[in-house]
Structures are given as C-alpha cells and as structure tokens.
C-alpha cells in the first residue's frame, strides 16, 4: 500500500548541499522546504542541517513571516543583532515579524 503524499521522512526531502546566495560561493545549511513539498500553503516548515562553520542565511529581519527554530542535536550559535548566543538540544528560538530583530 502506498503512503499518502503528505507523509514523508526527512531524509527523502533534503536538498543538495549547494545552497548559496547569488554571487556568493559561501555554502549555507543543507535544508529543504518540507512544508511546501508536503502541500502546506499557510505554514512554512523547513529542515536545516547546519554543518560546522556554516550559517542558515545572511542576517535578516522578518517583516511579514514569523520564524521559529528548534535544536534537535548539536550546539549551534544564533546571531541576533550582532551578538552570538549559544544554543543546545531542546532550545527554541522565535522571531516575530515586524520587530526588526536581525538574525541568522
């Protein structure tokens, strides 16, 4: 029996390890827009695997969307308004829209 298209395993959704901004050769995290691939339209869900020495994005602030992260394993740092904050497994971080809080 085939599983419905809205059930998936994260390993089946990972994109290639080539994410970078146009004009930059800096490799970013390995990720995937899982929500979009599963057909979700009102909530964005992304998987991000953050290798040592990389970041998820360039610094930015959310204007329309809210952003939320949850650390499953490892000890990444989150950059917020120029300051690094250590995270550990089980930590959450949330960025409400319209606050001007810059992060990566």
PLM segments and residue spans:
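Short beta-strand His + acidic residue motifs that chelate non-heme Fe in jelly-roll/DSBH
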Residues: 58, 78-79, 95, 101-104
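A short, N-terminal "cap"/entry segment at the start of jelly-roll beta-barrel domains
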Residues: 1-42
């Amino acid at each position: 029996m085939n599983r419905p298209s809205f059930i998936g395993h994260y390993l089946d959704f990972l994109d290639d390890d080539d994410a970078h901004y146009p004009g930059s050769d800096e490799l970013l995290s390995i990720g995937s827009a899982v929500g979009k691939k599963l057909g979700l339209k009102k909530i964005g869900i992304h998987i991000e695997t953050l290798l040592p020495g990389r970041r998820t994005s360039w610094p930015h602030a959310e204007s329309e969307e809210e952003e939320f992260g949850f650390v499953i394993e490892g000890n990444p740092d989150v950059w917020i308004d120029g300051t690094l904050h250590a995270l550990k497994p089980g930590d959450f971080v949330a960025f409400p829209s319209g606050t001007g809080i810059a992060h990566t």
